[in-house]
Amino acid sequence: MKLRISIAGPAAQEDALLAKITASAESLKQLLGEDAYAEELKPLEELIGELLVARGETLSTAESCTGGGIAARITSVAGSSAYFQGGIVAYANGIKQAQLSVNPADLLVHGAVSEPVVKQMAVGVRKHLKTDWAIATSGIAGPSGGSEAKPVGTVWIAVSGPG
């Protein structure tokens, strides 16, 4: 969600208007707490990079339905090599098992597009690539392949991090 605050008034009252905007922004920050991640308009991948650099932390990705799209966006940011270690595109279940340590039983019971599997993908890539953080995705992109239980458009996303 993006929120833009604007207040209009005479130019002679510019200082008073700026004070109102600042007070409104501060109230919103208190209300949103840690759910607010930026006060300026920047792409999410750039903000993630700035945060990782500031913390001295690293990131990896494990992608199925996004096919490397997240990694592409992360690496589109200048300087991303300082924090992005790499990614694994694991479309096939065998790759999920071999490269990401996904439990074959969970694939059989829950399927590749499921909470337990995507969590294991995130943990697996974080451990395999030795990063602080990992993002994993698995889903049914369509146009076919969906079911009543898992329709086209179903996506699971997991983040694995320290602690």
Regions found by a protein language model. Name each.
Residues 15-163:
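Short alpha-helical segments enriched in small residues
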